[in-house]
């Protein structure tokens, strides 16, 4: 799947939005990728995650376990794992706390794992996911996402693969360009849902 075909999946689903958005990182942007619109369509999700699995296999070879950060990474992680013939697990956070691996999930010695995300903006969720796995016996070989909107700057401490890399500008709330500041902001993300 080419980068243009990936973006067309988002456009045709109405998931490539323009406006003034408050991202889950707290940064602001004029562009938002509404991945839950994508994930509500099983056929579209299957196409994208099959392509991601192909990219992962080409770079990392055998993968035994896909680890995803809850909530946004669970669907693409599961579907990508299905195409890899791997197990799908996830990390989750207690309200206000770090990600942890619970529910009996583990990465045993001798296994190869990859972190799968939906969209990477700053890389924070993937970094926090990786930090939560530091005591696991298996090897976390890399990370992958559908779209890296950081322009390749979302450093997570592992190789990061994506179907598309975009350089979508983000801004601190006190450093908005005038044209963005003139539009009332909306917060479509989910990270704040876990905060009290």
From Swiss-Prot:
Gene3D superfamilies: 3.40.50.2020
Keyword Magnesium: yes
GO MF, any single term: orotate phosphoribosyltransferase activity
Statement: the UniProt record of this protein carries the keyword Glycosyltransferase: yes
InterPro entries to which the protein is assigned, alphabetical: OPRT, Orotate_PRibTrfase_bac, PRibTrfase_dom, PRTase-like
Protein EC: 2.4.2.10
Record's catalysed reaction(s): orotidine 5'-phosphate + diphosphate = orotate + 5-phospho-alpha-D-ribose 1-diphosphate
Pathway(s) this gene product operates in, as recorded in its UniProt entry: Pyrimidine metabolism; UMP biosynthesis via de novo pathway; UMP from orotate: step 1/2
One Pfam family from the record: Pribosyltran
Superkingdom of this protein's organism: Bacteria
Enzyme superclass (EC): transferase
Alphabetical GO biological process terms: 'de novo' UMP biosynthetic process; pyrimidine nucleobase biosynthetic process
Record-listed orotate binding positions: 121, 149
HAMAP family documented for this protein: PyrE
Family classification: Belongs to the purine/pyrimidine phosphoribosyltransferase family. PyrE subfamily.
Name of the protein: Orotate phosphoribosyltransferase
Gene source species: Methylorubrum extorquens (strain CM4 / NCIMB 13688)
